A protein has these predicted regions:
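Surface-exposed loop/turn motifs in large extracellular/passenger domains
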Residues: 1-30, 36-260, 264-289
Length: 289
């Protein structure tokens, strides 16, 4: 188990740090007394704010050996804070692979003394992944009280899983307690066969002016039963408006379970006063295979 930090402070802010990872020899996946493999890369860890931090990753992260524990994880955390802002943090991954499930956070909630702590804001953060393969799950997550102008880009990315019961799904989720506005998820040349695929921009009070772009993408199901869940929603909220979903050449495997595919520019919660309006779907080449 390894933890790498570009910066850390337990009573204040940590800003403007860069962590460059270019391994000459990938991290080994091995049996050990813990019974699992878990490694973490932190741009910053602080209590009152993490801003303008960058993680750059090149070359393979792990050996090609497969580990099979539900606790396995490779965590890439651009910014983690108990309060304050988590803005302008960036993660770049190029020409790499991992046989551990990969979890990427530009900002994340923290559990302390059975209480959840969220950054006040997660704005103008960026994740860019190019030429990358995860042989387990791949998840990118942004969590804050407010989240705006965040961008997540995939280009030539694979999330390859088996049909085991440790499949936790592959997801991109931007989630805000209050508002999530002007965020973009742009996926190109991507494939995933995770049991649970979720690509969501969501907030409790308002999700507006968000955009999800899907180009040349395949979603499949590793299970022999051909059962899984796929959700693509650009604005999930009690007030979702002016969101856009653009689909160009999306291929779906056979999902045999009912109520398994949800694709929409906007969706509302079950509250009677929830509303959704001025949302747009552009679709070209959408088919089952």
């Amino acid at each position: 188990m390894f933890n790498f930090y570009a910066g850390a402070y337990n009573n204040g802010e940590v800003n403007y740090n860069t962590l460059n990872i270019e391994l000459k020899h990938p991290l080994e996946i091995a049996n050990n007394f813990l019974g699992y493999n878990q490694h973490s890369f932190y741009g910053d860890f602080a209590t009152k704010g993490v801003n303008h931090n960058t993680i750059n990753i090149k070359n393979d992260l792990t050996t090609t050996d497969l580990s099979q524990s539900y606790k396995d994880a490779l965590n890439i955390v651009a910014g983690r804070t108990l309060e304050g802002n988590a803005d302008y943090n960036k993660v770049y991954i190029n020409n790499s692979m991992s046989t551990l499930p990969v979890y990427i956070y530009t900002a994340k909630k923290n559990l302390l003394n059975n209480q959840d702590f969220y950054p006040s804001s997660a704005n103008n953060n960026k994740v860019s992944i190019k030429d990358f393969a995860s042989f387990r799950n791949l998840t990118v997550l942004t969590e804050a009280k407010e989240a705006s102008y965040n961008t997540i880009n995939y280009n030539n990315v694979q999330s390859i899983t088996d049909a085991s019961n440790i499949d936790k799904g592959s997801k991109i989720i931007i989630r805000a307690l209050d508002k999530a506005n002007h965020n973009t998820i742009d996926i190109k040349n991507y494939s995933s066969n995770a049991a649970d695929n979720a690509y969501l921009i969501m907030a409790y009070n308002e999700a507006a002016y968000n955009k999800i772009i899907i180009n040349d993408t395949l979603f499949g199901v590793a299970s022999d039963k051909r059962e899984g869940i796929l959700s693509i929603i650009a604005g999930l909220s009690n007030n979702g408006h002016d969101n856009t979903l653009i689909i160009n050449n999306l291929n779906l495997d056979e999902y045999k379970n009912n109520n398994s595919v949800f694709i929409a520019p906007s969706a509302i919660t079950g509250l009677s006063e929830a509303k959704s309006y001025n949302n747009t779907l552009y679709r070209r080449e959408f088919k089952y295979i």
